[in-house]
């Protein structure tokens, strides 16, 4: 039976019921709905709606129901209930009779669903924080295992300057750290309970909403009933964090897809995260990474859809808000899956150290070192930049790397160049000079790795 049937003289059209019902997706809020109902029953005792004995019977029935839901959440989908709130109430009435009908006193589905969704977001957020840290740990472990590997750094997908594989991996650790921080901030902002705000104007019962909020694990209660039942900022904000983090993961995926190509050959992906072709037997496709890259659009699209659903909505609750769940559930599920898949990709990732070194030595990636050498000889940087550009053009013509040019060849472009230029053009020298904070000097990268290992160990502990 619908929770709102008394006002209507005829039943809903079956097509409308199918269109309107939300149980097929909001069943995922079952545990949170029961958790909120347990706390609400206690609050009703304090205002004299329920006796302690009645609350005890309801509590016992809800504990049994919670255990059943945890064991088999999909059982809920066998019901024709309108939504998860209707289903939980029907189960309680079946268990304790008319006593179950008293539980909704002073409560609306508007504040109820807002509470359920926030509780779900809190739990899912903690799970996602763990997945972010796990991926960071995977990146740090891979960086440590391949610390000696040098590879070319790119700008505009052109070889630019040598970096190390560890420095590359730590760049993504930094991105994920910002994702972690943003998620923590979002969880702090949603840590207020709307339960007790009723449909929109508050409840007529003197509920201690602060105590009620704390009982459910919130930091406190919301302050304005109109805002409380219509607020979906936390949904948009979590989707935004997911979208930005997925954008980071897409960059990670694209880098490794490129590094894994036959043309680059910098890394080899494990068979466990690749697939083959139904036609071409030689193929080993980076499907895990391509799916991460592709699913980014799905998550970003969900955020845009939610923003448009909320655009210009009048206060307070409107049925449009039912659109908050499917996109949110899918976005956070997808983000979680992609974080875990990215970590899996790293487990058996092989770095071709010789290939990466050869690539780092090619492409005139040491041209900046020659310019810095000229600056050290007293030539203004802009002039040095021009000299090196001309030198590179010549080196391309004679098909030599810079370090293989003879001294007379160098001196065609600047007489200040001496024999001491050659040590400056060596691969390790180019790394060693990057000593400012955040640079690729090996001692800096090692220190950054150690620091990351230490704070990740604290998280794991």
Curated annotation (Swiss-Prot):
Q: Which E.C. number(s) belong to this protein?
A: 4.3.2.1
UniProt keywords (A-Z) are:
Amino-acid biosynthesis, Arginine biosynthesis, Cytoplasm, Lyase
Provide the protein name: Argininosuccinate lyase
The biological processes this protein is annotated with in GO are:
arginine biosynthetic process via ornithine; L-arginine biosynthetic process
* Source organism of this protein record: Aeromonas salmonicida (strain A449)
Query: Which HAMAP family does the entry link to?
Result: Arg_succ_lyase
Compartments where located: Cytoplasm
Q: What InterPro entries has UniProt attached to this entry?
A: Arg_succ_lyase_C, Argininosuccinate_lyase, Fumarase/histidase_N, Fumarate_lyase_CS, Fumarate_lyase_fam, Fumarate_lyase_N, L-Aspartase-like
- Catalytic reaction equation(s): 2-(N(omega)-L-arginino)succinate = fumarate + L-arginine
GO MF annotations, alphabetized: argininosuccinate lyase activity
* Pathway(s) it belongs to: Amino-acid biosynthesis; L-arginine biosynthesis; L-arginine from L-ornithine and carbamoyl phosphate: step 3/3
One of the record's GO cellular component terms: cytosol
Per the similarity annotation, which family is this?
A: Belongs to the lyase 1 family. Argininosuccinate lyase subfamily.
SUPFAM superfamilies recorded: L-aspartase-like
Q: What is its main location?
A: cytoplasm
Q: Which domain of life is it from?
A: Bacteria
| Gene assigned in the entry | argH
Do you know which PANTHER family this protein is assigned to? Answer: ARGININOSUCCINATE LYASE (PTHR43814:SF1)
